[in-house]
Amino acid sequence: MALSDGFSFLCSDAIFGRRTQHLSADMNRTRIGLAVLLIGAVAVGFSYVRKQSISDSHRQTRQIILYYTLSRVDNPIIIVGDSIVEASILPRELCGHAIVNAGLDGASTTSDLGTWLIDVLDGKPVAAIVVSLGTNDALGAARSRPQFEANYRALLAQLSKATARVIVLAIPAIDALRRMTSDMQTEAMGRINDYNSALPELSKESGATFAALPPMPTPHTIDGVHLSAAGYQVWNQAVLQGASALCGSK
C-alpha cells in the first residue's frame, strides 16, 4: 500500500469515527428528548387523573355528609346546585325551616341531582327546593339551549316528586377577570343569556317558580366565575326572597 493510500485510509477511518460519534450523540439526544416528552405526558396525565380523583372524592364525601344532614332535619328548604351554591353562606333557617346547602362542585344539568336527592330523602317531606344551575353547562360543556332545556326540564320533573315548591334561580353573569378573558366571557355570556331567557317559561311549564337575579356590581366575582362577597350579597337575597313565599303560606 502506498503512503498516500495509507494516509487516506486513516483519514477516512477518523472521519467515519467522528460521524459515528455524532450519530451516537444525536441518537442519545433523541432518546433523551423522547424520554422527557414521555415523562411530561405521564405527568400531565397523572395530574389530570389526580385532580379528577380529588374532585370525585370530594363530591362523594360531601354527598355522604348531606345524607347525614338531610336525615336529621324535617321539612327543610334545600338549595341544590354547583360550586356557587356550595361556597355560599346562607342563614341556618327561614321561617322555621332549616336551610340545607346541597351544592356540589362541578354540578350541571347532567349531574343527575334529582335522582340523587330523591334517593337521599327516601320519601321525607321537603318544604321547598331552590335550584341554581347552568354555569358549568355554559362554560365547560357549552351545551346548546335545546340540550339545556331538556336537561333542566327532566331535573324539575324529578324534584317535583319531593315537593310542590320548586324555585328556579337565574344563572349569575360572569366577569372578564383573571383567566376569564373578554372573548371567553362574551362566548359564555351568550349561552348564559340564552339559558336565562328560557328559564321563566320552563319554570312555568314545570310548575316551578322563577327567581330573577337583580343586577350585580362589576366585578362581582373573585375569578370571573365564583362570586365575591358583593356578588353573594345579591345572590343570597334572591335565594331567600324566592324561598320566602313559603313563609306566607304557613
Model-derived regions, located:
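N-terminal secretory targeting modules
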Residues: A2-V80, V85-L90, D122-K124, K204, ...
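Alpha-helical cap/lid subdomain in secreted, periplasmic
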Residues: R31, E93-L94, A98, G114-K250
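N-terminal post-signal-peptidase region of extra-cytosolic proteins
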Residues: Q63, T109-L117
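Conserved beta-strand elements of the Class I
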Residues: I78-V80, V100, I129
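Flexible, active-site-adjacent loop/turn segments at secondary-structure boundaries
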Residues: D82, A102, H220
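Active-site metal-binding loops of divalent metal-dependent hydrolases
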Residues: S83, L104, T135
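Short active-site-adjacent helix-start/loop capping segments
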Residues: A87-S88, S108-T110, D137-G140
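A short beta-strand-loop structural module common to alpha/beta enzyme folds
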Residues: A98-S111
